[in-house]
Amino acid sequence: MQSRLSVRDFSMVIALVLICGFFAVMAPPFLSARNLSMLMTELSITGTLAMGMLMIILTGHIDLSVGSGVGLLGGLASVLVFKQDLPAPAALAAASLVGVLLWLLMGTLIVRERIPAFIITLGGLLIFKGLFWLVIQNSTVPVTRGGVANLYSSLTTFYVPPMAGLVLAALLVAILVWASLRSRAQLQAHGFPVEDGESSFLKLFIAAQAVFLLVIVANQFRGVPLPALILAMVTFVVHTLTKHTSFGRYLYAVGGNEEAAVVSGVPVQKVVIAAFGLMGGIVAVTGFMQTAYAGASTTTVGELMELDAIAACVIGGVSLKGGRGSVLGVLFGTLIMACLLNGMTLMAVPPEFKFITRGLVLTLAVWMDVRLSKA
């Protein structure tokens, strides 16, 4: 098992290096400070959504409605701000509450009525898309009123000052090291096998270098964009939940073997419903960032984001069968997808070939998951 995980981990690193190297040669602006700052914003939005998707997939379920939910909740907040003149914080809070309630409802239907998540969330995809268009009345709704900046619009226009960015980078690396050492100690204390020290150190070293490199490059433009901080906070919360709480252990148990989890006393229904409730909150946050990044709610906001989130998870080593996956893997998967899409945009690749490439990458990731699972 350990060797298979190492193959997957290092294959992701190699793939990322090759992708970045290719676009650095074919599209020189790819490594510019301005583009990397934009890339950081884009991957932060997708990565935030993928963190929620990780928890859903860990339970052995799937959520196809998140893309439409991103549009709906972002659009609802825009309408409350622009048309109802509601203060931005109140509008964001109201839309977040709606998101949590909608996803709690879907989670309840899945576990109480025993309806497959695929069907429930597919229905949600269509319903939320229709509601989204009704809410914005098939028009463009700005995130500001009278062009005056507010909390909503600042989600993607605020940048952390350079020195503060470096301090936050150091803090993030310290948290990564602490979390890794704590997790390793807990596994050893319970007699579970742990990764060899060299591999663990190499991963942390690469992660630390990547964090500082991104911050240094971002500081050459305007600084670290706010979405990157939001992703960091969401990532920390999800990592803590999945690795250091009973809820996280239940997520893995339900996805690994639901029948065994029931016998062991795991409250399966509550765990799944809670995972969907958290997903609703994360969809809302993603919707606000995506809409603010676009500058307004339009009928295309959120399109296919569910596929990008699923692809980031699968590329990052999350098993679609449930019970296996990690936050770090999802971050790598998100980074690979974001670099791929950003690079193709810089090369002016036609949309049809972008779709084909995304489909091929997702298919290849699933194929590798199946092959490594059988090895």
Model-inferred region functions:
Residues 180-196, 236-276:
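Membrane-helix/interface signature in polytopic inner-membrane proteins
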Residues 19-84, 108-118, 133, 260, ...:
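Single transmembrane alpha-helix segments in multi-pass membrane proteins
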Residues 1-21, 25, 140, 172-205, ...:
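Cytosolic-side transmembrane-helix boundaries in multi-pass membrane proteins
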Residues 42, 117, 143-146, 161-170, ...:
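Loop-to-transmembrane alpha-helix initiation sites
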Residues 103, 276-287, 293-359:
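Transmembrane alpha-helical segments in multi-pass inner-membrane proteins
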Residues 28-38, 133, 137, 215-228, ...:
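Inter-helical junctions in multi-pass inner-membrane proteins, predominant
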Residues 85-126, 332, 337:
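Alpha-helical transmembrane segments within multi-pass membrane transporters and channels
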Residues 125-242, 298-299:
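Transmembrane helix-bundle core of multi-pass membrane transporters
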